[in-house]
From Swiss-Prot:
A single GO molecular function term of this UniProt record: chitosanase activity
Protein name, as recorded: Endo-chitosanase
Primary enzyme class: hydrolase
Catalytic activity, reaction form: Endohydrolysis of beta-(1->4)-linkages between D-glucosamine residues in a partly acetylated chitosan
Role this protein plays: Chitosanase catalyzing the endo-type cleavage of chitosan, the deacylated form of chitin. Chitosanase may be crucial in the degradation of the deacetylated portion of chitin in the fungal cell wall. Chitoolisaccharides produced by the hydrolysis of partially N-acetylated chitosan are known to have many biological activities, including antibacterial activity, immune-enhancing effects, and elicitor activity.
GO terms under biological process: polysaccharide catabolic process
Domain of life: Eukaryota
Main location: secreted
Gene (UniProt): csn
GO cellular component, one term: extracellular region
Signal peptide feature range: 1-17
Amino acid sequence: MHFAGIVAIALATGATAYDLPENLKQIYEKHKSGKCSKELQGGYDNGHSHDGKSFSYCGDIPNAIYLHSSKNGGQYADMDIDCDGANRHAGKCSNDHSGQGETRWKDEVQKLGIDDLDANIHPYVVFGNENDDGDDPEFDPRKHGMEPLSVMAVVCNKKLFYGIWGDTNGHTATGEASLSMAELCFPEEDPSGDSGHEPNDVLYIGFTGKEAVPGKSADWKADSTESFEESIKELGDKLVAGLKA
């Protein structure tokens, strides 16, 4: 990508990149190294062959769930691209050959006035794993207090972004988010349906409790990622402020 293109993307997304508050900086550094002491479910990979099935859902942060691996001295997750939902072949999702026609919480989304989440607009995180064939470890975040379509915090590129829990994974893959979330996090990498962010340095934080659900206060009909993220920022800030390092 030409430098001018990178600058244009950065300017377009910069308004929604939030600085890390001090407690989140401490959380990121503290929980990255070492092992997860409160493993909720392990046996997952990052969708690639390296690092094996070393990833787990961890409950070491009170009132939150996050992904972690003890490999390489401790690491978080990568960001593969999900294009499921509405307009799944639109824009830079056009080269995604693994997308599905709907997201996990489509029925709930329709109650909020839209047909389904749009990976090109809604910055959602793929979190939790369905037991597709009976042999894979299942993890349902709802059993640990998370609610569908609740706000999630994503620490990437040394910045904070807000998204929602919008989909689940099959089998053992973890570390996935919608195209629009990847564009917020890594505009300089020009993500697409077939190209994500490989380093395991992304911290996905899901919040437990019904208070993490924005409901109708979120701008589900937003025509841009920035507008949607701004509509959940106040709630996201409140949830992040409550995290203890």
